[in-house]
């Protein structure tokens, strides 16, 4: 009987078992993949920062739009009151003018009828 050889068994030439140099290429691929992952993570961080910044700007814009809406509503109310005020003022002037014309007409009629 022969004693078994100590150490790893020898691989056959067509066996396809990984050798030293392919291990280096797998490390290189792993490093490239890790670099790509790091790049994607950096891009995603930038995108998240942009989204948060956009959200802040949209919130500010929404607040400004609400304030503008409130101002527009107040302006509309004030404009309606002002329109009503000047309409009544115009009516008063028309009534006064009508009364003055009626008085003048009555004076003329009375003056010429006697």
UniProtKB/Swiss-Prot annotation:
Chain positions covered by the region annotation Disordered: 1-31
Keywords: Acetylation, Cell membrane, Coiled coil, Cytoplasmic vesicle, Membrane, Synapse, Transmembrane, Transmembrane helix
Classification via InterPro entries: Synaptobrevin-like (IPR001388), Synaptobrevin/VAMP (IPR016444), V_SNARE_CC (IPR042855)
N-acetylserine modifications at: 2
Main location: membrane
One CC-aspect GO term: synaptic vesicle membrane
Gene Ontology BP term (one): synaptic vesicle endocytosis
Localization per Swiss-Prot or TrEMBL: Cytoplasmic vesicle, Secretory vesicle, Synaptic vesicle membrane; Cell membrane
Domain v-SNARE coiled-coil homology: 29-89
Ranges per topology, Cytoplasmic: 2-92
Segments crossing the lipid bilayer: 93-111
Pfam families from the UniProt entry: Synaptobrevin
Alphabetized GO MF terms: SNAP receptor activity; syntaxin-1 binding
CDD domains on file: R-SNARE_VAMP2 (cd15870)
Parts of the chain on the Vesicular side: 112-114
Signal peptide: none
Biological role stated in the UniProt entry: Involved in the targeting and/or fusion of transport vesicles to their target membrane. Major SNARE protein of synaptic vesicles which mediates fusion of synaptic vesicles to release neurotransmitters. Essential for fast vesicular exocytosis and activity-dependent neurotransmitter release as well as fast endocytosis that mediates rapid reuse of synaptic vesicles.
Protein name as catalogued: Vesicle-associated membrane protein 2
Organism: Xenopus laevis (African clawed frog)
Gene: vamp2
């Amino acid at each position: 009987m022969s004693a078994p050889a100590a150490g790893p068994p020898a691989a056959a030439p067509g066996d396809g078992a990984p050798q030293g140099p392919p291990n280096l290429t797998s490390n290189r691929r792993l490093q490239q993949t890790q670099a790509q992952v790091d790049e994607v993570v950096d891009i995603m961080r930038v995108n998240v920062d942009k989204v948060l910044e956009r959200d802040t700007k949209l919130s500010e814009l929404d607040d400004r739009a609400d304030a503008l809406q409130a101002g527009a509503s107040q302006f509309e109310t004030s404009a309606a009151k002002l329109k009503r005020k000047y309409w009544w003022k115009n009516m008063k002037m028309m009534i006064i003018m009508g009364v003055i014309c009626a008085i003048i007409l009555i004076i003329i009629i009375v003056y010429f009828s006697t």
